[in-house]
């Protein structure tokens, strides 16, 4: 599972949930990609589950790129603990995903196979998604 190697601070404030993605909204590596339509916290376990679903479907062919990284710690206090006594300890890591963010890319397999792999991955994620295709230079919508 994905976690940062080292962090400056063990505990962070809760991430902001408003607005659209500032960067990471264009396909950089693959031919097809999975794009977020909602704001969501995606845990390292969910990212790993989606990756496994994709790689199992494409078998040995193709390449998958993960474009998000869980760099925010989410803390929790133990059950039945009274309020106070400081902030809880980090439980898991999340990637803050906003609308428009490209989360996964895939290449090297037929389009139908890639679409199905991305569809399977989308079922493992807590947000609505859409599958987008790389626009070739000179196609509509560019320029």
Swiss-Prot record:
The segments labelled Disordered in the record are 1-23
GO annotation (BP), single = translation
Q: Name one GO cellular component term.
A: cytosolic large ribosomal subunit
User: By its UniProt entry, which Pfam families does this protein fall under?
Assistant: Ribosomal_L16 (PF00252)
Which residues lie in Basic residues bias regions?
1-14
Alphabetic keyword roster: Ribonucleoprotein, Ribosomal protein, RNA-binding, rRNA-binding, tRNA-binding
Listed SUPFAM superfamilies: Ribosomal protein L16p/L10e
Q: Which Gene3D superfamilies match?
A: Ribosomal protein L10e/L16
Origin: domain of life:
Bacteria
Gene Ontology molecular function, alphabetical: rRNA binding; structural constituent of ribosome; tRNA binding
Q: Which family does the entry's similarity section mention?
A: Belongs to the universal ribosomal protein uL16 family.
Report the protein's function: Binds 23S rRNA and is also seen to make contacts with the A and possibly P site tRNAs.
| Record text on subunit structure and interactions | Part of the 50S ribosomal subunit.
- What's the name of the protein? Large ribosomal subunit protein uL16
This chain's source organism reads: Desulforudis audaxviator (strain MP104C)
Q: Which gene encodes it?
A: rplP
